[in-house]
C-alpha cells in the first residue's frame, strides 16, 4: 500500500466539469511519486454521484470517501486525516488542475526535511483584517504569509495534531486558512516551516513567494497546480491583475517581503499582531 494519499475533493454544486478538468490533468501529468488517489464526494448525499461524475473517473484507480457534513473544505480535510491510513497527504480542492509532470514528488520532497511542516503550490501575504476590532483580533496585519489551501502536502501525523473546527462560512474558512490560529500559524507554532513549491521543483520560503511566479506574479509561469483564483488572474485584464496582485503582495512587494514573518524555528520572526 502506498504511504501517500492524494485527496481530491469533489463538491457536488460544481457539477461534473470541474472533476473532468482535474482528471484530464491527472491523466496527462505523471505525479512522479507512488500514491493512492482518494476521491471525496462532498455534498452528494444519497444516492451519491451521478453517471457523468463516475464516467470522468473511468480507468483511474481510486478509492472513494463520502462526506456530507455541512462544512467547507478544511474540516473535510481534517476528517480525511483521521480516516485514511497514510504517512503523507496531498490535498487538492475541487477547482484544482495539475500543470507539470512530477507535481506530487515536488510537493513531497521538502517534507523529508524534519524542519518543514507543509508545502503548497501557492501562498499569499493577503490579510482581510480591517479597522473593525473583532476582525483585528482574528487576523494578523499585512503582510500575512500563509499557504493557500487549494493544493498542499503535509504529514498525516501533523495534520491530525492541528485544529480543524467546523466552519460553514467563507469568512470562517479564510480565518482557518490565514488567521491568527489558522493552518499556517498552527504549523509555525510547532517550529516548522511552510514552503511554496514551484513548477521548477524548488521550494520557496515566505520572503521569496512574491518572486516565485506561482501566484499573481511573474505571469504565474512557475505554477504547479492551478485553481479558480489563479485562472481568474490569468484571464483578467491589466487593471484587475494589478488590483489582485496588490491584494496578494502589496504596492511594494519587496518591502512587504522584508517585513513578513517567516515561521519555523519556533514560529514567526515578529509578533503576528505587530
Model-derived features with residue positions:
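Short loop->beta transition adjacent to catalytic acidic/histidine clusters or analogous donor-positioning motifs
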Residues: 2-5, 29-39, 62-63
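A conserved hydrophobic helix/loop-capping motif in glycosyltransferases and polysaccharide synthases
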Residues: 4-18, 40
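Short, well-formed alpha-helical segments that are part of the catalytic scaffolds
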Residues: 13-30
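Short, charged/polar "capping" segments at the starts of alpha-helices
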Residues: 15-18, 44-52, 128-129
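Active-site-proximal specificity loops/subdomain of glycosyltransferases
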Residues: 45-84
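Short beta-strand-to-loop acidic/aromatic patch adjacent to the donor-nucleotide binding site
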Residues: 86-97
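Conserved catalytic core of nucleotide-sugar-dependent glycosyltransferases
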Residues: 97-181, 185
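C-terminal catalytic/acceptor-binding lobe
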Residues: 169-274
